[in-house]
Amino acid sequence: MTTVDTILAAKYPAKAHALRVSESLKARHGGAGVIYLEAQKTRLIEDSDEDMPFRQRRPFFYLTGCLLPDAAVVYDAVKDELTLFIPPINPESVIWSGLPLSPEEAAKLYDVDRVLFTTDVNSTLASIASSHNGQTAAFAIAEQVSEGTSFQGFAETNTTSLKTAIEETRVIKDAYEVALLRKANDISTKAHVAAIHASKTATNERQIEAAIIGACIANGCREQSYHPIVAGGEGGATLHYVRNDVDLVDPVTKQRKNNVLIDAGGEYQTYCADITRVIPLNGRFAPETRQIYEIVLQMQTECIAMLKEGVCWDDVHALAHRIAIRGLLKLGILRGSEDELFEKRVSVAFFPHGLGHYLGMDTHDTGGNPNYEDKDTMFRYLRVRANLPAGSVVTVEPGIYFCRFIIDPILKAPETGKYIDTEVLERYWSVGGVRIEDNIHITKDGSENLTTAPKSIEEVESLAL
């Protein structure tokens, strides 16, 4: 067994998470008597008798490690006692779906003190309130409490603070969570390699997407962290491209497109990988793509080298822009001085998004405190506005894009158009976009890259040939 598999052979650390959330609530509110959370409900597709695809509620999973629908959990913070509630057996459901998990089986699977049926929720809450002499508060999430659930007997029912406490606690991952993220990355790396192999003969983006999803499922990620992006040629200039069904042969030139941008990651036990690579469709990168790729790889390499506990994410993002400016100046796409281009925010036309985001149970994980109202366009879409704590996991995903919709207004504005050489720029529209994205675990003195998907030009071309 690998180190990751050894760690994951243990139970998901639900009680440790419950304690951390309780301590967060205590720091803000003087203590939590009880925490109550519900799993996602079984829901039907509109106008159908088919179940909707199931996605577990993240707050519930964080305190249970349980993927069952229609369940609940209660944490008695005074006794440090975690109780999981699972649905009772429905004889009619057994006919179609088989026997559900029993309380005894659930107790062996999950890091909880006891397992009861959901029919016992109210009596359990009442018993806890009584044992606390009505002196403690109950915490829940307002929109995630079923009708009929009663918090009678508690001094207060707070439905506003728990969500924030969980989201802030989730920023710092424990060793088990890092192992889950590493596992998701390992499987997703296999998917990206499968995508490179598929690209050799693929005639349409969807064939590459199929290879990604198939490799993820075959290796243990039944779900994708997000809708995969498979963008050939100029499609790579669209940040969240969703078509994935365009032919890879240019309809005008009848030539195979130069490259394809792939942004895809599998979800393993609710934990996400988020990886982006650009691969050549003709075995080797076209000269213009190669030049942009080298700049983006340098942006990522230098930004990752800067990472450690306490680093300001704004500063890392700014470094990425400066490296982009230097590279585009060298190619002749930009003209002027580095400082002037930086101050005028000209590079935002080519690198319009943030450098990355927290990663965990959500692709854009909680706790980043972005400011989408920021008047500074360089930082408006930065999803993390903080000094990075040790234990956090971030994506580092610089990119350079040639999107006419974004660049044209900059070209037409007299105060910024003078900084771009349109004749040189014309050679790069076919590149579309280059983004390189890895998942980085922040440590006290540096960082650890969880992503092993090939990314050097030599590695990628050797697989693509």
Swiss-Prot record:
Q: Where does Mn(2+) 1 bind?
A: 274, 397, 437
Q: Name one GO molecular function term.
A: manganese ion binding
Signal in keyword set = no
**Which GO BP terms sit in this record?**
proteolysis
Q: Which UniProt keywords apply?
A: Aminopeptidase, Hydrolase, Manganese, Metal-binding, Metalloprotease, Protease
Q: What does this chain do?
A: Catalyzes the removal of a penultimate prolyl residue from the N-termini of peptides.
Please identify the protein, giving its name as recorded. Answer: Probable Xaa-Pro aminopeptidase pepP
Native source species: Penicillium rubens (strain ATCC 28089 / DSM 1075 / NRRL 1951 / Wisconsin 54-1255) (Penicillium chrysogenum)
The gene name reads pepP
